[in-house]
């Protein structure tokens, strides 16, 4: 099994730069933000649970109403916890499947701005914390 590298850091810290460097070394990169967006739009479990929480109009014509989701998500910390409790487990499951697909690789990497906050640190073997000063 591949060694799983977690890449995290604040906004503008250079996570994407580190990911690109690792990618140049042929290390597969799982971009958790992108995958969470993809799963929120397509995963049946997420769609069902979000619809149960926010109503059928969340997916209009099968398309996610991002504004409605964002309005709810950012209205309170409690709302964010509810949304994260729906999405994060599915992203973790997807990451595990993705790792299985890349099991022949020596290393794989997971880029996540909220690696620790989301509990994804338990999914990786080593963490790279990216930090860049403001100047």
Identify the role of each PLM range.
Residues 25, 54, 123-124:
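Short, structured coil segments at secondary-structure junctions
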Residues 94-101, 107-135:
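ATP-dependent NMP and nucleoside kinases share a basic, alpha-helical "lid"
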Residues 13:
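ATP-binding Walker
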Residues 23-32, 44-45:
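Post-Walker A helix-loop "phosphate-sensing" segment adjacent to the P-loop in P-loop NTPases
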Residues 16:
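Walker A/P-loop
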Residues 10, 22:
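P-loop (Walker A) phosphate-binding loop of NTP-binding proteins
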Residues 5-7:
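Hydrophobic anchor at the beta1->P-loop junction of P-loop NTPases
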Residues 37-106:
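ATP-dependent small-molecule kinase phosphotransfer cores
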């Amino acid at each position: 099994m591949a060694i799983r590298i977690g890449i995290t850091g604040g906004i503008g810290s250079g996570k994407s730069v580190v990911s690109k460097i690792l990618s140049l070394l042929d290390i597969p990169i799982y971009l958790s933000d992108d995958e969470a967006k993809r799963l929120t739009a397509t995963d049946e479990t997420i769609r069902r649970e979000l619809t149960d929480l926010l109503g059928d109009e969340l997916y209009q014509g099968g398309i996610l109403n991002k504004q409605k989701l964002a309005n709810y998500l950012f209205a309170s910390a409690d709302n964010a916890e509810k949304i994260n409790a729906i999405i994060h487990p599915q992203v973790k499951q997807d990451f595990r499947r993705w790792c299985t697909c890349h099991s022949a690789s020596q290393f794989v990497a997971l880029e996540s701005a909220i690696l620790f906050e989301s509990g994804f640190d338990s999914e990786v073997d080593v963490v790279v914390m990216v930090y860049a000063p403001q100047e």
